[in-house]
Amino acid sequence: MQSEGSDQDWTDVLKIDGIRKSWDMNRKSLLKKKLLSMLSVILVLSGLVVISVPVILQSASASAQSGVASRSAREVAGWPYPRAKETLKAARAYNRRLAAAGQHALGEVKDPFTGAEGSISDKKYTSTLDAGDGVMGSIEIPKIDVDLPIYHGTSESVLELGAGHLYGSSLPVGGSDTHSVITGHRGLIKALMFTRLDELKKGDSFYVKVMGETLGYRIDRISVIEPSDVSKLRIVKGEDRVTLMTCTPYGVNTHRLLVSGLRAAIPDEVPYASAVRDTRPLPGSVVAAYVLAALCVPLLFQRPVEVPRHSSRVPAGRARRRNP
């Protein structure tokens, strides 16, 4: 009897030892899975950050630029009468002289994106239509969610701040025999500006806000030109035109995209700016990143299945036999 009891005790001990080894292996397997899950989540979150940072920077930049345009409009609204009217009158006189002279120069040198700053030397130009800090007014394109201040000239320092007015084109105050050219950067990581200009179609509208007035324009012409080609930027007798210009193709920038519109009455020919909405959804890459994050982040907080580290019990029905 003693021998049989001892044999049974050793059998139970070996079984318990096997169970403990199995538990240890399970714990190691669970730990490995947990580490892999955490690594996957970290990689997904890193990708989310890479995708989100430009979006955040662009949103912050757009908000700041829109704020500049709004502050400039409020400052003009606070001017004593008839300062704004006199400023518009001087700008229209400037445009008449420009049309009569035949536009001998267009741009800082030849191309507004060269970075030169020739307009700065023309004090008559820089002092005309100045709402303060070099701001003329603002360009609003509701369909692509653009609201930028318009500055004198198209130097690199200006285009970092907002849209620039092409030196040698009409000042953006409307009127017959005028053609104002507004330029903006495209494809910057930290700012959208005119990045989405290629989404506009014929019939879409944009708006120039200047000295308390809002001028509506309806797009009738979209074209691509060589940087040195200014034929489509010149004044045409009888027209009241504004052309928006940026670099193209996206990221290559060897040509210039022109989106041009003729003056249109608000609200008979174009709607109020407030009635136009940007209906573009979030970019697919951003949506995908957020979906992945929503699925993966909970893994960080998921508790693993608890496996007892030690146990002194033998499974039911396997109690060790004791000698009487």
Regions found by a protein language model. Give the residues of each.
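N-terminal intrinsically disordered, acidic low-complexity segments at the extreme N-terminus
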Residues: G5-G18
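Solvent-exposed, non-transmembrane regions of membrane-associated and secreted proteins
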Residues: G18-I19, W23-N26, L30-G284, P315, ...
